[in-house]
From Swiss-Prot:
This is Glutamine synthetase. The gene is glnA. Mg(2+) 2 binds at residues 139, 192, 199. L-glutamate binds at residues 243-244, 301, 307, 319, 338. Mg(2+) 1 binds at residues 137, 248, 336. It is an enzyme of class 6 (ligase). One of its GO terms (biological process) is glutamine biosynthetic process. It comes from Methanococcus maripaludis (strain DSM 14266 / JCM 13030 / NBRC 101832 / S2 / LL).
Length: 446
């Protein structure tokens, strides 16, 4: 059987009556068109045609896509991603398939975030025989509604706590089972540092599959929380005074089918490729965060304290540096970029991280010496003496860095780059001109 026939067999076996053709906008927010599966020979013929060729949609209302005068677009399903949604009824079930966005002339749409990542990966493969693997650690909060109608942390537990303190153990159990039904290899789940904060870790994979998984992960958790009358949020810093939510990204590149970060004879057992990749990440870090930390709120997390990864340095085990190389060495040697948060569009975030790292490899950059001291405890003068800079303090400063970065501009492509800058500058202006509760409390007495 070909791929379409296999998909039709899966649909029949699982009694699928609706298929969600899913894609994401420039923010990484999932969108979909629900296609009803029809009975009879005519229905089967139509289904085959849709699975093979895709479905048309109007792209003019999708932020960051196209204008109304050129709005017709097509969703072409990646049939490897077809999966029944485990939270929907098993009778007359609902499946989703992740799609690539195409123009009506049959070419990949340059504003499709998934297509953007695939384009950069294809170039990497063509030039260096390269593969990019990512293992993210997205954190999130589970909230409950209090008597005043406010959303507050659903439990009072802390890091690695057990029930009864850990009031989120039941919802995490449901999340793990649902993710496994969706094909995830879940490695661990636990309560995080802050009240109501959680983490569920899943196995690394190639960058496109991992980005698909991040989108599915967030949808699954939000849906299951809502079914229990709770709210799941991936907002980077929902509450003042406690840790925010990050999405540390473990990553490695393979060249010609072999891992490229390990060298038993080298200092720290890290290859020249690894050192140059780290140097590239550090060199572009101030621009990268505009994409990996893309909201005004992201920079409420990226402040000194609360274990925030603001220091542009690398280390072997020191978590106060923005890049860390975890202890295991060998085939699984990887680096960890600690700045990203789960508000990012994973396709675009992985694109800019890879582009930055590969720029370091191509330029044969040398990484500075690792900083194994606690950078959080250093004064600004001490950090300056060590040559340790910080990421931008707000979204606008990060956007200004990105706007002048030709490497990341080329990776994102003209369409996404210009739309991202425009949309995010508008977001910053909206924030900048808003009058906040803090200002009212502080200045109303004047």
């Amino acid at each position: 059987m070909n791929a379409v026939e296999q998909a039709m067999e899966y649909i029949k076996t699982n009694n699928v009556k609706f298929i969600r053709f899913q894609f994401v906008d420039i923010h990484g927010e999932p969108k979909n068109i629900a296609y009803p599966v029809k009975a009879g020979a005519a229905g089967e013929e139509e289904l085959y045609d849709v699975l093979e060729k895709g479905v048309y949609f109007d792209g003019s209302s999708i932020e960051g896509f196209v204008s109304i005068e050129s709005s017709d677009m097509m969703l072409k399903p990646d049939l490897k991603t077809l999966s029944v949604l485990p939270w929907r009824p098993t009778e007359k079930s609902v499946a989703r398939v992740i799609c690539d966005v195409y123009t009506t002339n049959g070419k990949p749409f340059e504003g499709d975030p998934r297509g953007c990542l695939k384009r950069v990966l294809a170039k990497f493969d063509e030039e260096l025989g390269g593969e990019f693997f990512v293992g993210p650690e997205p954190e999130f909060f589970i909230l409950k509604e209090d008597a005043c109608g406010s959303w507050v942390p659903a439990d009072d537990a802390g890091y690695f706590d057990l029930e009864p303190l850990d009031g989120g153990c039941d919802i995490r159990r449901k999340i793990v089972f649902a993710l496994e039904n969706l094909g995830f290899h879940v490695e661990a789940s636990h309560h995080e540092v802050a009240e109501g904060q959680h983490e569920v870790d899943f196995k690394f994979a190639d960058a496109v599959k991992t980005a698909d998984s991040v989108v599915t992960f967030k949808t699954t958790i939000k849906t299951l929380a809502a079914q229990d009358g709770l709210k799941a949020t991936f907002m980077p810093k929902p509450f003042f005074g406690i840790n925010g939510s990050g999405m540390h990204c473990h990553q490695s590149i393979w060249l010609n089918g072999e891992p490229s970060f390990y060298d038993e004879s080298a200092q720290y057992q890290l290859s020249e490729t690894c050192m140059s990749y780290v140097a590239g990440i550090l060199d572009h870090a101030k621009s990268i965060v505009a994409v990996t930390n893309p909201t005004v709120n992201s920079y409420k997390r990226l402040v000194p304290g609360y274990e925030a990864p603001v220091n542009i340095a690398w280390a072997n085990s020191n978590r106060s540096a923005i890049v860390r190389v975890p202890a295991p060495r060998g085939k699984g040697t990887r680096i960890e970029f600690r700045a990203p948060d789960p508000a990012c569009n994973p396709y675009l975030a992985f694109t800019v991280m890879l582009a930055a790292g590969l720029d370091g490899v191509k330029r044969k950059l040398s990484a500075i010496e690792p900083v194994e001291k606690n950078i959080f405890a250093m004064s600004e003068a001490q950090k300056k003496a060590e040559g340790i800079e910080s990421v931008p303090a707000n979204l606008k400063a990060a956007l200004d860095e990105l706007e002048n970065n030709s490497v990341l501009k080329d990776a994102l492509g003209k369409h996404i780059f210009e739309n991202f800058i425009e949309i995010k500058n508008a977001e910053w202006d909206s924030f900048r001109t808003a009058v906040t509760d803090w200002e009212t409390k502080q200045y109303l007495k004047i």
